[in-house]
UniProtKB/Swiss-Prot annotation:
PANTHER family assigned to the protein according to its UniProt record, in alphabetical order: 1-(5-PHOSPHORIBOSYL)-5-[(5-PHOSPHORIBOSYLAMINO)METHYLIDENEAMINO] IMIDAZOLE-4-CARBOXAMIDE ISOMERASE (PTHR43090:SF2)
Gene3D superfamilies xref list: Aldolase class I (3.20.20.70)
Database matches in CDD domains: HisA_HisF (cd04723)
Protein family (similarity comment): Belongs to the HisA/HisF family.
GO aspect biological process, one term: L-histidine biosynthetic process
Record's GO cellular component terms: cytoplasm
Molecular function per GO: 1-(5-phosphoribosyl)-5-[(5-phosphoribosylamino)methylideneamino]imidazole-4-carboxamide isomerase activity
Matches recorded under InterPro entries: Aldolase_TIM (IPR013785), His_biosynth (IPR006062), HisA/F-archaeal (IPR004650), Isoase_HisA-like (IPR044524), RibuloseP-bd_barrel (IPR011060)
Name by which UniProt lists this protein: Uncharacterized protein MJ0703
Length: 226
């Protein structure tokens, strides 16, 4: 099971995401990095063994500029990147920013053109809020995606809360698909990681528990990492 640390980018700095209230995100404070400089945060992740990181460009998602220069500069680790793709134009825009081993995220929260789910070399984010998938049914999504496209179960309302993962939701999605499944939002401790591992989850996205020192990134990568 991969451990994929997260960076939320806003106004060129790393911020602490909580419950999807993006206007209220504050500069990141972390036990593993003294700076909210996203380059330094990414380096701290890599130094502790991370092979892939998740980046969300909150400015582009909110229609208020972008952080593409920062994303390009983080070229020393593989990335999966969410810019809130709505259209093919958005997808082509972010692909130009990424390296060949990076992947663009297509997320149900923002997607307008469901045909984009058929693209190769993407990651699809199943964005849930309070247990409900945003904008599409799961069957609609699964009828479009390629068999090898990873699916992120992202509980937006749980991001940054450390209130734990939704085991029933994870089981529900796993029962419906053989695609690789990632889980993000609300990881509170080792028990959540063990639960995801035992269920057969392929990767976990995590930030808050690492930055607060609840989980040691190097330790959990050594324990669960593939």
């Amino acid at each position: 099971m991969k451990i994929i640390p997260v960076i939320d980018l806003k106004d060129k700095i790393a911020v602490h995401g909580k419950s999807g209230n993006r206007d209220e995100y504050k500069p990141l404070e972390s036990v593993i990095c003294k700076s909210s400089n996203p380059i330094e945060v990414a380096k701290a992740y890599k130094e502790r063994g991370a092979k892939t990181i998740y980046i969300a460009d909150l400015n582009f998602i909110m229609g208020n500029g972008d952080n593409f220069d920062i994303i390009k500069e983080i070229d020393f680790i593989n990335k999966i990147v969410d810019i809130g793709v709505k259209s093919r134009e958005d997808l082509e825009t972010i692909k130009k920013v990424l390296n060949k081993d990076d992947r663009a995220i297509v997320a149900t929260e923002t997607l307008k053109d469901i045909e984009l789910l058929k693209e190769k070399d993407i990651v699809v984010s199943l964005d849930f809020k309070n247990g409900n998938l945003l904008n599409y049914s799961l069957d609609e999504i699964l009828s479009c995606v390629r068999d090898d496209t990873p699916l992120i179960i992202l509980d937006i309302s749980s991001v940054g809360t450390q209130r734990g993962v939704n085991a029933e939701l994870i089981k529900y999605v796993l029962d419906k698909t053989n695609n690789p499944v990632y889980v993000g939002g609300g990881i509170k401790g080792m028990e959540d990681l063990e639960l995801c591992y035992n269920l057969g989850v392929d990767a976990v996205l995590i930030a808050t528990a690492i930055h607060k020192g609840v989980l040691d990134l190097e330790e959990i990568i050594n324990k669960f990492g593939d």
